[in-house]
Amino acid sequence: VELRASFSGFLQFGTAGLRGPVRPGPSGMNRAVVGRTAAAIAAYMKERQLTSVVIGRDARHGSEDFTQETAQIMSGAGMKVYVLPRPLPTPVLAFATNELTCDVGIMVTASHNPPQDNGYKVYLGGTVDGIHYRGSQIVSPADESISAHIDAITSLSRQPRGHVWSIVDEEIVSKY
């Protein structure tokens, strides 16, 4: 039953990002699903000449691995990548998006979902497609565009991986 559930569809990306149980297959949160989503966000960013991203995480199972996967994909796409120094609450990521003047913020968290879940939220820092975000969560049509990019990615093996990013200083937490 669990194997069938793991491969019985895809997690859907929307304004709340992605959320689901940590498990294998396209209907779960795992490195492949996160990598595909990160690559789609990188493509979305490139289309709009957005070049910087800050990534945060909570302490849930898988969050650290998903952060690493995201940082590698974003770095490989040529983005300036910042990673928050440790597990932190989501509002710190939104604050850091503005404070670091990043174009995009990505938070690895399932928020209020059950503990066996994880998730992925996206924030925008500046003006994108005529909407001034200032570190707020995406709204339509950004979610639809990212979702279309996810659908267009057929293989992660062709996605370049980078290993260059900056760990944000703890001072950002004090400023928050």
Enumerate the predicted regions with their spans:
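An N-terminal, well-structured beta->alpha segment
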Residues: V1-G76, E171-Y176
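Gly/Ser/Thr-enriched, mixed-charge loops and adjacent short helices
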Residues: E2-L11, G119-Y176
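Short, amphipathic alpha-helical segments
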Residues: G35, E64, P87, S136-S140, ...
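Alpha-helical scaffold segments in soluble metabolic enzymes
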Residues: R36, A40-A43, V92-A96, S145-H149
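Ferredoxin-reductase
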Residues: R48-V128
